[in-house]
């Protein structure tokens, strides 16, 4: 993105404040364009009226991310990769979390193939208010047989996940594309030997393609430039992923060089980067647990350092959980704390005799408290106070959590302590103990100070509930 101020974007908008974009003013819409929560296509006059055509083209150019965004797949499960504008998250944020595709082989028994694909498609891990998922399937043409590969593609496509077709044989890739028309898979890969044929497939079927040159950035850039000049825009870079030793060091360095060059304005190499942690299984590690461990280490390294998409093998929980957790953490937007909606929540099946607790709406705090309560079978009312997504201790210190705000939260939730429960008592977090007196005055209720750590709530309840 070459502009970073709403005022700069505003110059290219109709400036009529028509409201068709859903915002009251064009300036408000310009702000959405800058923080990438809105798109130029959301402004009907800008799109439909010919007099704005030049402004639209220029605005799209200025708003385009430094690293091209590439879409793989179609529909709700399609994934975007790339699209970043900075080298370091604190300067803005990272967009489009690293996408994790897991491999299958086209020579697998059908039952085993279906079972593995279902394992990928059905993976769910609830984490801080959302389900973490695996992103897609990479189909490796181990057989090098076009017919067998096409059959595997048809079977995998039934899961509805985005796909990567892995073969250096253009005939195999073409068979896969015929079996998955209009599903927009990613082709892996074009190299110095097959670039012409694979490029023709990418143009004919309008699909994204990986260009590959192991540890040769000059060749990689040449391939990408050649494809761009041929009209292929959706390109992914594979500089090679070596699993150990100097090769791994070179891989790490190459990722840094590519991304730095792209962010600094070298458009010929400003594309998403593919990492291949599954090469850990080719490093001669006999023990599958150790191989899986090393694959996870590699995935972690390249999640942190600019891997936009990766192909992995191990589906063991000890491998997938750290991989998806790390990606979720690295791609959390530092500009906006992760939060839940403020309001009153039921934990279990609370009654008029159940305890009433409150915490802040910082997602990690809320879900930790909720989990500690529900996992111990405690039915209660849990109020999330809107503190702009800040945790209890910091919110108390910064004034985002006060007695007035707690009272407002109860009022907005329509929860009257005098009538909704029989005990007229509320439990405050231990880290908010200083609010006890003010809360009693504001709420007209009995306020008990709970434990400092929500993990101690069950023991605290045994000693202090019901109130005497």
Swiss-Prot record:
The keyword RNA-binding is assigned to this record: no
Associated pathway: One-carbon metabolism; methanogenesis from acetate
Record-level GO BP terms: acetyl-CoA catabolic process; methanogenesis, from acetate; methylation
Enzyme class: transferase
InterPro entries (alphabetical): 4Fe-4S_dom (IPR007202), Ac-CoA_synth_d_su_TIM-brl (IPR016041), ACDS_complex_subunit (IPR051069), AcylCoA_decarb/synth_gsu (IPR016218), AcylCoA_decarb/synth_gsu_arc (IPR023427), Dihydropteroate_synth-like_sf (IPR011005)
Gene3D superfamilies: 3.40.50.11600, Dihydropteroate synthase-like
GO molecular function: 4 iron, 4 sulfur cluster binding; iron ion binding; methyltransferase activity
Pfam families named in the record: CdhD, FeS
Cofactor(s) annotated in UniProt: corrinoid; [4Fe-4S] cluster
DNA repair as UniProt keyword: no
Record's keyword terms, sorted: 4Fe-4S, Cobalt, Iron, Iron-sulfur, Metal-binding, Methanogenesis, Methyltransferase, Transferase
PROSITE patterns: 4FE4S (PS51656)
Catalysed transformations (reactions): 5,6,7,8-tetrahydrosarcinapterin + methyl-Co(III)-[corrinoid Fe-S protein] = 5-methyltetrahydrosarcinapterin + Co(I)-[corrinoid Fe-S protein] + H(+)
EC number of the protein: 2.1.1.245
Biological function: Part of a complex that catalyzes the reversible cleavage of acetyl-CoA, allowing growth on acetate as sole source of carbon and energy.
Subunit composition and interactions: Heterodimer of delta and gamma chains. The ACDS complex is made up of alpha, epsilon, beta, gamma and delta chains with a probable stoichiometry of (alpha(2)epsilon(2))(4)-beta(8)-(gamma(1)delta(1))(8).
Name this polypeptide is given: Acetyl-CoA decarbonylase/synthase complex subunit gamma
Gene source species: Methanosarcina acetivorans (strain ATCC 35395 / DSM 2834 / JCM 12185 / C2A)
């Amino acid at each position: 993105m070459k502009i970073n101020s709403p005022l700069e974007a505003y110059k290219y908008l109709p400036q009529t404040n028509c409201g068709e974009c859903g915002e009251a003013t064009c300036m408000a819409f310009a702000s959405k364009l800058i923080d990438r929560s809105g798109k130029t296509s959301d402004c009907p006059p800008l799109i439909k009226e010919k007099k704005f055509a030049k402004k639209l083209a220029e605005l799209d150019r200025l708003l385009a991310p430094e690293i091209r965004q590439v879409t793989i797949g179609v529909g709700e499960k399609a994934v975007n990769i790339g699209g970043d504008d900075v080298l370091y998250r604190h300067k803005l944020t990272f967009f489009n979390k690293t996408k994790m595709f897991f491999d299958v082989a086209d020579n697998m028994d059908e039952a085993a193939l279906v079972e593995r694909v279902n394992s990928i498609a059905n993976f769910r891990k609830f984490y801080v208010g959302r389900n973490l998922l695996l992103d897609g399937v990479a189909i490796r043409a181990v057989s090098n047989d076009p017919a067998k590969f096409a059959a595997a593609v048809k079977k995998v496509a039934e899961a509805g996940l985005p796909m990567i077709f892995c073969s250096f044989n253009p005939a195999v890739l073409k068979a896969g594309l015929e079996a998955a028309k209009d599903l927009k898979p990613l082709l892996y890969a074009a190299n110095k030997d097959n670039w012409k044929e694979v490029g023709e497939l990418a143009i004919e079927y309008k699909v994204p393609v990986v260009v590959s040159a192991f540890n040769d950035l000059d060749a990689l850039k040449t391939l990408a430039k050649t494809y761009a000049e041929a009209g292929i825009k959706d390109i992914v870079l594979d500089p090679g992923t070596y699993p150990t030793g100097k090769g791994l060091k070179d891989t790490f360095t190459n990722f840094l060089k590519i991304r730095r060059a792209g962010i600094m304005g070298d458009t010929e190499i400003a594309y998403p980067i593919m990492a291949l942690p599954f090469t850990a299984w080719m490093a001669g590690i006999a023990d599958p647990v150790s191989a899986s461990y090393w694959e996870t280490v590699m995935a972690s390294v390249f999640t942190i350092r600019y891997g936009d998409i990766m192909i992995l093998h191990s589906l063991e929980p000890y491998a997938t959980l750290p991989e998806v957790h790390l990606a979720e953490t690295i791609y959390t937007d530092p500009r906006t704390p992760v939060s839940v909606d403020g309001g009153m929540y039921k934990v279990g099946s609370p009654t008029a005799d159940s305890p009433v607790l409150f915490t802040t709406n910082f997602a990690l705090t809320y879900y930790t408290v909720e989990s500690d309560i529900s996992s111990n079978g405690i039915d209660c009312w849990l109020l999330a106070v809107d503190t702009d997504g800040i945790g209890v201790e910091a919110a108390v210190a910064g004034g985002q959590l006060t007695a007035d705000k707690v009272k407002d939260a109860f009022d907005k939730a329509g929860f009257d302590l005098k009538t909704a429960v029989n005990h007229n008592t509320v439990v405050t977090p231990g880290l908010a103990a200083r609010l006890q007196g003010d809360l009693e005055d504001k709420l007209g209720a009995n306020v008990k100070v709970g434990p400092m750590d929500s993990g101690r709530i069950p023991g605290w309840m045994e000693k202090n509930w019901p109130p005497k």
